[in-house]
């Protein structure tokens, strides 16, 4: 298969993965309206082409939370990444480090912090959920500090799991799920050998280390379902700050009032995100929500955005709408499933190349220059861009 754009990796991943895994990463909540709008709304953002601007001094690098990034992109936290490629979190982290950007390890990763951090030569980020088991949260924060994690990404849009109907049809959940997954693995021998056999153990490393016993897929589902905490409030940020003094980013912001509260409670950054359309179907796409949030808090903290980003052009669109940087989630997992570390490195090369083209043709010399001026007048008026 020829890979000429990030979108090609989705088809390659679908061919390689058992359906329960492909649809787990590909699907969203309920009827998946928000999932689709994340992509379509971003694609509708029209840029303002400029010419004869002398673009010989173009630069994609940026500063974020005391780090220099080769481009304004980080890999998002994605649970179960180690099921998409052999020791997948390690491969993805190495790819990010090779391209000079951060990798964010999920709370529910297959590979534990202690396996991933030593595998790369730059600090990584760590994502944490608010869970009823505060002992686990303290343990995770202590281990993250010991491993040299620099930035904490605190996910706040999962006080309860979203209703993901596609999972019941694919075999990730629902009747006879274990049997269906086993049969699917048998019909995908390359994945079964490379990941299913050689990629063991398939524990949730960060949780298993704390609990002192292996945590398989069914344990993962049950443990998370029992530990999501609907009592989560802004006061939990104060509790986190007792244990974490480094940069803290609040992930899951869609409303300007919540963004202002994040500033008030001392967050260093936010991620404008609807969890990739995997939580509440029917909410705004990130691209639609971003301009009002940027208008409310731009300059008071760093604004990141995710959900729907599939190209370097999309990165430039998000920056023009008000983001300082973006997180890539599904896009890198597709590439990881299709080609491992090399696939993710190639994806990031494609993203960088597409960003360069978009910046040259919009006349923006640096990441700092990308603003609402890079958007067409029609888009600016429709999006109410600050």
Swiss-Prot record:
It is a peripheral membrane protein. One of its GO terms (biological process) is lactate metabolic process. Keywords: Cell inner membrane, Cell membrane, Flavoprotein, FMN, Membrane, Oxidoreductase. Signal peptide: none annotated. InterPro entries: Aldolase_TIM, Alpha-hydoxy_acid_DH_FMN, FMN-dep_DH, FMN_HAD, FMN_hydac_DH_AS, LldD. It is found in: Cell inner membrane. GO terms for molecular function: FMN binding; L-lactate dehydrogenase activity. NCBIfam families: L_lactate_LldD, PRK11197.1. This is L-lactate dehydrogenase. It comes from Xanthomonas campestris pv. campestris (strain ATCC 33913 / DSM 3586 / NCPPB 528 / LMG 568 / P 25). The gene is lldD.
């Amino acid at each position: 298969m020829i890979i000429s754009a990030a979108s090609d990796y989705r088809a390659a991943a679908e061919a390689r993965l058992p359906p329960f895994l492909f649809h787990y990463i590909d699907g969203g909540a309920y009827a998946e309206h928000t999932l689709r709008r994340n992509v379509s709304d971003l694609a509708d953002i029209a840029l303002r082409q400029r010419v004869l601007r002398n673009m010989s001094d173009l630069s994609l690098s940026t500063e974020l939370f005391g780090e220099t990034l080769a481009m304004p992109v980080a890999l998002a936290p994605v649970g179960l990444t180690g099921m998409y490629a052999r020791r997948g979190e390690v491969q993805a982290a190495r790819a990010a480090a090779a391209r000079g950007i951060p990798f964010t390890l999920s709370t529910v990763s297959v590979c534990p912090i202690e396996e991933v951090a030593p595998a790369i030569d730059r600090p990584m980020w760590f994502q944490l959920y608010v869970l009823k088991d505060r002992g686990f949260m303290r343990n995770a924060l202590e281990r993250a500090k010991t491993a040299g994690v620099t930035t904490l990404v605190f996910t706040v849009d999962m006080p309860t799991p979203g209703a993901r109907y596609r999972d019941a049809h694919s075999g990730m959940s629902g009747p006879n799920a274990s049997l269906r997954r086993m049969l699917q693995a048998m019909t995908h021998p390359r994945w079964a050998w490379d990941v299913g056999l050689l990629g063991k153990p398939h524990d949730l490393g960060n949780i298993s280390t704390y609990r002192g016993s292996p945590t398989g897929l069914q344990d993962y589902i049950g443990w998370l379902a029992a530990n999501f905490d609907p009592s989560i409030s802004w006061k939990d940020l104060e509790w986190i700050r007792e244990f974490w003094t480094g940069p803290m980013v609040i992930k899951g912001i869609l409303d300007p009032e919540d963004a202002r509260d994040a500033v008030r409670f001392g967050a260093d950054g936010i991620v404008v995100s609807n969890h990739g359309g995997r939580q509440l179907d029917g909410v705004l796409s990130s691209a639609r929500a971003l301009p009002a949030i940027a208008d409310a808090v731009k300059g008071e903290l760093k604004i990141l955005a995710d959900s729907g980003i599939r190209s370097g052009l999309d990165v430039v669109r998000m920056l023009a709408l008000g983001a300082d940087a973006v997180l890539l989630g599904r896009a890198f997992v597709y590439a990881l499933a299709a080609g491992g570390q090399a696939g993710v490195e190639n994806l990031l090369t494609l993203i960088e190349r597409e960003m360069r083209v978009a910046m040259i043709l919009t006349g923006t010399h640096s990441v700092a220059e990308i603003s609402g001026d890079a958007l067409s007048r029609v888009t600016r008026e429709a999006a109410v861009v600050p």
